[in-house]
Amino acid sequence: MKRQRATKSAAQRHAVPATNGTALAERAGRPPRLIYTLLEGRGLLELAALPLLLPILQATPRGDGHPVLLVPGFTASDATLIGLRVFLRSRGYHVATWGLGQNTGFQRKFTQALEQKLRYLHHRHARKVTVVGWSLGGVYAFYAAHCAPECVRNVVSLGSPMRFTANTDQVPLLVKALYRYFAHPMGPVAHLSHVRGKLLQSPPPVPSACIYSATDGVVPADAARIDGRHGQHENIWVPGSHLGLGFNAAVMWVLANRLAQPEGQWRPFEPQGLLGEIYERAAKLARTI
């Protein structure tokens, strides 16, 4: 009985849905700390450290070969997904990217094309697809899972603005300016407010995870998590920047764990072994920041 309580406690600390949606939404309205935004260049350090950590990542569980669809972040293209693509292929997955060029905002032409690609991969492989999206790509991933849940095995967001509201003050000025330039003169709210409402009211009935960083300088941690409305959603913390999430060894470690679960046998994220102990200690430290 004692061991069961300890396991539950660990799961609650790192991989359980937020229970107070109102409080989470209120905190999601705050912008990221300026110091985190100014230090986003540390993503280059995460990229530089990745080759040194590859031997550890090669010890992560191999997958069963099911297809994985990757979606890039805002203003980014498939080229930014090379780290995730190479790693997931090394774990045995059939990896595809969205193939739609630069992500210039949440737009109908992209949502329709992404859903078509999701259905195509499902048909081609005769297996359900895991959809992983970085930043704005995570909103696309959840939206696609909402539109075609019968095709989706898991959906994972990486530092995605899942809970931005109509309060534009929470959006960093640079992001706001880029969105106005590439997508819409009104900024992110023009496209995303109605999408978020739909996602939060009726999340896809598939296993889902929001991976977030407490020191994200673009999307604040509370905005990158969502309130779980079913028993298979989890919010998972990782250390790092926003711009480095696609090359972050901790992200890859978590993804390998989540994607390797047998289909239909979902369990919450529970760090194991030496890396698990290090993760636990780092998570405790992060809560004091």
Where on the chain are the PLM-derived regions?
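C-terminal catalytic-base region of ester-bond hydrolases, centering on the histidine
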Residues: 204-289
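N-terminal hydrophobic alpha-helix used for membrane targeting or insertion
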Residues: 29-31, 61, 142, 205, ...
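Flexible, membrane-associating and regulatory peripheral segments of lipid-active enzymes
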Residues: 1-68, 81, 86, 91, ...
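Serine-dependent carboxylesterase/thioesterase catalytic core
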Residues: 66-79, 83, 89-205, 211, ...
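A structural signal for alpha-helix termini and helix-coil/disorder junctions
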Residues: 47-50, 120, 180, 184, ...
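Residue-level signal for alpha-helical context at structural boundaries
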Residues: 62, 106, 132, 163, ...
